[in-house]
Amino acid sequence: MSAAEIKDKVYDIIVSKMGVNKDQIKPESKFADDLGADSLDTVELIMELENEFGVQIPDEDAEKIGTVQQAIDYIVNKKVS
């Protein structure tokens, strides 16, 4: 899966889980501040990313994922390694 495909899928998951329009999402968008996620939304988003991409995201790593780009980069790095 290419980085572009991962980005598209991450965007789709955000739209599905958070009820935002795809055009509202930017790489620098912060889940809490820009997209209105609360802590439960964030946990559900991380779980969906784990399920969709077949990766484990430990809590200490999940706490560092605050923007859309950080989520994409994390998944890309996990899928490559």
Curated annotation (Swiss-Prot):
One of its GO terms (biological process) is lipid A biosynthetic process. 4'-phosphopantetheine is transferred from CoA to a specific serine of apo-ACP by AcpS. This modification is essential for activity because fatty acids are bound in thioester linkage to the sulfhydryl of the prosthetic group. Keywords: Cytoplasm, Fatty acid biosynthesis, Fatty acid metabolism, Lipid biosynthesis, Lipid metabolism, Phosphopantetheine, Phosphoprotein. Pathway: Lipid metabolism; fatty acid biosynthesis. It holds the Pfam family PP-binding. Residues 4-79 form the Carrier domain. Carrier of the growing fatty acid chain in fatty acid biosynthesis. Belongs to the acyl carrier protein (ACP) family. This is Acyl carrier protein. It comes from Chlorobaculum tepidum (strain ATCC 49652 / DSM 12025 / NBRC 103806 / TLS) (Chlorobium tepidum).
